């Protein structure tokens, strides 16, 4: 018996196990007509199977699709820009920025050995592993950054936001993926870690926006992510700039939290 991710790689269905994992996570792998949801699924190689694997993701992680939606909705063009990706993980956001023409991306993550191998080798990517973004400074990111993107888990963004202003250009933009499950109190989180109540989702957006405003970053645009989180949570993509905006509450109120 062979793991499905290994089987896909060895038999030419995927170029690497990372690619196989992405296809599995996206629900793009079937064995005998059954969608495979786990890379640990075992295939009996002594039996002939009808295996289908579609590598339809344009980025190394599904997060790239979320950032793509934000860049389009907010009319932000990374072409020729210096960027920072906080919470880079496998590099979905970083990959999206590069494919949109970014000339340099600081890929920052507190973990290690997560960034896609091809991205590690890309000369435009500065991989900063084992870096706690709560202590981000100009020594860690020496360049003035045009675009900061952020997708962090298991920590409130409010602990990182105070560090952003020192590396962001005066005319720069900050795009963040707001995950209510990491911004709300325990009372808001239900079974499976899901935040179901619209009022709690709204509270999460307001909390992040308030933290940004306290640090000179103001909400300019906001959308509901077209893709839910891996755990099924509704998420939001927000755009902040250093330009004061008196319409923040109107922007917040214009989004569906149901």
What are these regions (language model features)?
Residues 79-89:
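Conserved class I S-adenosyl-L-methionine
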Residues 227-257:
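Core SAM-dependent methyltransferase catalytic element
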Residues 29, 103-106:
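Short beta-strand element of Class I
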Residues 1-48:
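A basic, amphipathic helix-loop patch mediating RNA/tRNA/ribosome contacts
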Residues 106-159:
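S-adenosyl-L-methionine
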Residues 180-197:
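Short, glycine-/aromatic-enriched active-site segment of Class I SAM-dependent methyltransferases
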Residues 158-175:
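A short glycine-rich, Lys/Arg-flanked "PGG" loop and its adjoining helix->strand segment in the class I
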Residues 90-101:
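Conserved SAM-binding loop of SAM-dependent methyltransferases across substrates and taxa
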């Amino acid at each position: 018996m062979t793991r499905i991710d290994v089987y896909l790689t060895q038999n030419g269905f995927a170029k690497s196990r990372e690619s196989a994992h992405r296809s599995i996570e996206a629900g793009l792998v079937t064995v005998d007509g059954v969608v495979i949801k786990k890379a640990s699924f075992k295939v009996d190689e002594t039996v002939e199977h009808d295996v289908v694997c579609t590598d339809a993701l344009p980025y190394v992680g599904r997060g790239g699709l979320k950032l793509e939606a934000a860049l389009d909705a907010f009319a932000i063009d990374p072409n020729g820009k210096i960027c920072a990706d906080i919470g880079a993980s496998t590099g979905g956001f970083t990959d999206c920025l590069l494919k949109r023409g970014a000339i340099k991306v600081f890929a920052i993550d507190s973990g290690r050995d997560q960034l896609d191998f091809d991205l590690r080798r890309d000369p435009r990517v500065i991989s900063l592993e084992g870096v706690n973004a709560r202590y981000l400074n100009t020594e860690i990111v020496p360049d003035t950054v045009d675009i900061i993107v952020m997708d962090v888990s298991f920590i409130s963004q409010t602990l990182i936001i105070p560090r952003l202003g020192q590396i962001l250009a005066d005319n720069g933009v900050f795009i963040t993926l707001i995950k209510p499950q990491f911004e709300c109190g325990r009372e808001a989180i239900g079974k499976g870690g899901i935040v179901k109540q619209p009022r709690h989702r709204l509270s999460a957006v307001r909390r992040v926006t308030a933290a940004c405003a306290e640090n000179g970053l103001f909400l300019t645009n906001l959308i509901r992510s077209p893709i839910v989180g891996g755990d099924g949570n509704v998420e939001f993509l927000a755009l902040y700039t250093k330009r004061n905006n008196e319409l923040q509450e109107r922007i917040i109120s214009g989004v569906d939290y149901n």
